[in-house]
């Protein structure tokens, strides 16, 4: 368990106090993949770097388990950092070392015997699919391969927590998907707690269990990804979701003016996503429908669907009751 208790961070610049992170309270459960999303300057990198005290907090407390990280001395901090791995946007690999040498580096710093290092490096390169690249140098690798080396290096000391600082931002979409699949596999197989920061809601949707949304250094929304993604409350969250779904809300509302009837958003979650609920209820209630927008996808392993439909004729109240009885969430957009 990682607990932020009124943790905050400020800087002094030319005699002025700049607040990077306002006091916040947050809990991240053991074994979770927890996402932190925000635009540039929102405070997300500051937040993740407070966990291993690469940034020193200005106040508040940070607990990992029962240990108060904010109270650790230098020796305690070194021990903590061996339990926390970190991967970076631009990989931070040592260009003069081979792939195997980069993965071995934290073990060498820890004084691990050579035989153990060699065995651990071989194990980790197999895990990230780079066995055949052990003797290559970073300059000979693709971006995705470099990030896999970074992941292997971060796992070298068998950490309990893995911090991912914009780990996919420098990668193309296909490589991003493969790296996210690898992180999800590591989470499942090793039970690591993963804290991932990004400015892309699609990354959150694919891999995270819960998410926190930061805006101008403030925590504005948090919750399970299914809830936050499908029913965003804060304006910043709604913008992120619209960008992920490639929906122009203003354009969509202009389209509403061209159609009559009651406009609703229907949200299907789980196996019900694939059931012919809309057609059945239309037949039962005499309601006609016009689909204005639709999407079927997955949030991590959970299928979901969203339709925006215009309903005309028939019994609207009976239709709404039928949707609710079928487990479909109904949001009135225009009555």
Swiss-Prot record:
It is found in: Cell inner membrane. SUPFAM superfamilies: ACT-like, P-loop containing nucleoside triphosphate hydrolases. GO terms for cellular component: plasma membrane. Residues 2-241 form the ABC transporter domain. It is an enzyme of class 7 (translocase). Its main location: membrane. It comes from the Bacteria. It is a peripheral membrane protein. InterPro entries: AAA+_ATPase, ABC_transporter-like_ATP-bd, ABC_transporter-like_CS, ACT-like_dom_sf, MetN_ABC, MetN_ABC_transporter-like, NIL_domain, P-loop_NTPase. ATP binds at residues 38-45. It catalyses: L-methionine(out) + ATP + H2O = L-methionine(in) + ADP + phosphate + H(+); D-methionine(out) + ATP + H2O = D-methionine(in) + ADP + phosphate + H(+). GO terms for molecular function: ABC-type D-methionine transporter activity; ATP binding; ATP hydrolysis activity. Keywords: Amino-acid transport, ATP-binding, Cell inner membrane, Cell membrane, Membrane, Nucleotide-binding, Translocase, Transport. Its EC number is 7.4.2.11. Part of the ABC transporter complex MetNIQ involved in methionine import. Responsible for energy coupling to the transport system. The complex is composed of two ATP-binding proteins (MetN), two transmembrane proteins (MetI) and a solute-binding protein (MetQ). Belongs to the ABC transporter superfamily. Methionine importer (TC 3.A.1.24) family. This is Methionine import ATP-binding protein MetN.
């Amino acid at each position: 368990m990682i607990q932020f208790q009124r943790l905050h961070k400020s800087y002094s610049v030319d005699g002025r106090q700049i607040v990077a992170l306002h006091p916040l309270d947050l809990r991240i459960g053991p074994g979770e993949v927890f996402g932190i999303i925000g635009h540039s300057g929102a405070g997300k990198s500051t937040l993740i770097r407070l966990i291993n005290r690469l940034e020193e907090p200005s106040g508040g407390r940070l607990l990992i388990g029962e240990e108060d990280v904010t109270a650790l001395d230098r020796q305690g901090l070194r021990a903590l950092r061996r339990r926390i791995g970190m991967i970076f946007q631009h990989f931070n690999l040592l260009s003069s070392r081979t792939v195997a040498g980069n993965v071995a580096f934290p073990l060498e710093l820890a004084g691990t015997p050579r035989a153990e290092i060699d065995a651990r490096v071989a194990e980790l390169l197999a895990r990230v699919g780079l066995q055949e690249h052990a003797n290559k140098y970073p300059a000979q690798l693709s971006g995705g391969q470099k990030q896999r080396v970074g992941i292997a290096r971060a796992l070298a000391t068998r950490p309990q927590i893995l911090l991912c600082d914009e780990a996919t931002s420098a990668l193309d979409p296909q490589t991003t998907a493969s790296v996210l699949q690898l992180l999800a596999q590591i989470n499942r197989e090793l039970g690591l707690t993963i804290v991932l920061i990004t400015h892309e809601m699609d990354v959150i949707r694919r891999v995270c269990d819960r998410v926190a949304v930061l805006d101008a250094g403030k925590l504005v929304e948090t919750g399970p990804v299914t809830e936050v993604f499908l029913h965003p409350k804060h304006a910043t969250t709604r913008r992120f979701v619209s960008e992920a779904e490639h929906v122009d809300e203003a354009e969509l509302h202009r389209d509403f003016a061209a159609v009559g009837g009651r406009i609703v958003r229907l949200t299907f979650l789980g196996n019900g996503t694939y059931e012919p609920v809309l057609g059945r209820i239309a037949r039962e209630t005499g309601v006609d429908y016009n689909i204005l927008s639709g999407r079927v996808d997955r949030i991590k392993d959970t299928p979901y669907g969203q339709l925006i439909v215009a309903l005309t004729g028939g019994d609207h109240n009976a239709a709404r009751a039928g949707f609710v009885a079928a487990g479909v969430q109904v949001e009135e957009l225009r009555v």
